[in-house]
């Protein structure tokens, strides 16, 4: 059996200790983001109606769409002392979304239905979702105001006219429903909202063809469509007379 001389033995012990320290460091780095995912709590209807000050659960923050945060740590007396904590390169394209935040995780909906989840404290990536691209006829279809957190889901409305539910801790699709036809220009530009367990969305892109758009409600757990209403009434429908003698095929508009 070979015997290490004292120098080699000390070198071996030193390398082993360094390797162990490196492994512990890597394990700790991996454990931190995993702990965020493990500790994620489902978003309730009560939280959607009255979000915690530290959270931003939908595009405009609250159901009334005020886009106002009650946080007061940053004010006119200290705003000039703000410094960059971390930065993140977004997907190229038109950006009209706002980051969503819950339990220390920041969700970044971006152009053309690309979603990333990161550690809000330092930007460490947690997962990403990239929807297949389509050759859309609507030039603004990649620009949307997307995303609502509910239960353990991130619910988005896409440029190819689908509503999609992603698992908030993995980015995996839990359900998706086709609502319109992207090949004729229909798409979602506004994000979904959740009320009483229903996902409410309004279709866009109907100005490209002779038809009106609509608003739909879907079961948040399954995506099943529960009701649909046209935003432009047809002849014989309630308020249809408000369009006078305009035929149905010329009654069109967005939602």
Where would I find each of the regions flagged by the language model?
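Bacterial N-terminal signal peptides
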Residues: 14-27
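Blade/loop signatures of beta-propeller domains
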Residues: 32-84, 236
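Short coil/turn segments that connect the beta-strands within blades of beta-propeller domains
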Residues: 53-54, 103-105, 151-152, 196-198
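Short glycine/acidic-enriched loop and turn motifs that connect beta-strands
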Residues: 63-65, 114, 162, 206-209
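Extracytoplasmic beta-rich repeat domains
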Residues: 86-100, 128-150, 176-191, 230-255
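Conserved beta-propeller blade signature
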Residues: 105-109, 116, 154-156, 200
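Short loop/turn segments that connect beta-strands within beta-propeller blades
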Residues: 119-122, 167-170, 220-222
């Amino acid at each position: 059996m070979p015997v290490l001389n004292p120098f080699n033995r000390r070198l071996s012990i030193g390398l082993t200790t360094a390797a162990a320290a490196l492994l512990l460091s890597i394990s700790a780095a991996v454990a931190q983001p995993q702990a965020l995912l493990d500790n994620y709590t489902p978003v309730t209807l009560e939280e959607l109606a009255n979000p915690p000050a530290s959270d931003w659960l939908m595009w405009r923050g609250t159901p009334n769409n005020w886009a106002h945060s009650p946080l007061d740590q940053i004010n006119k007396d200290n705003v000039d002392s703000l410094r960059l904590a971390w930065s993140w390169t977004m997907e190229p394209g038109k950006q009209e979304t706002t980051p969503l935040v819950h339990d220390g995780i920041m969700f970044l909906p971006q152009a053309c239905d690309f979603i990333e989840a990161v550690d809000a404290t330092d930007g460490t990536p947690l997962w990403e979702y990239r929807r297949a691209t389509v050759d859309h006829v609507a030039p603004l279809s990649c620009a949307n105001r997307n995303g609502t957190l509910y239960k353990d889901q991130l619910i988005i409305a896409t440029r190819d006219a689908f509503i999609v539910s992603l698992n908030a801790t993995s980015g995996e699709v839990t359900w998706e429903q086709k609502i319109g036809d992207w090949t004729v220009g229909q798409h979602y530009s506004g994000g979904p909202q959740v009320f009483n367990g229903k996902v409410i969305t309004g279709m866009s892109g109907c100005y490209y063809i002779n038809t009106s758009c609509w608003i739909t409600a879907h079961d948040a757990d399954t995506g099943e469509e529960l009701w649909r209403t046209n935003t432009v009434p047809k002849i014989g429908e309630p308020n249809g007379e408000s369009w006078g003698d305009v035929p149905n095929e010329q009654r069109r508009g967005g939602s």
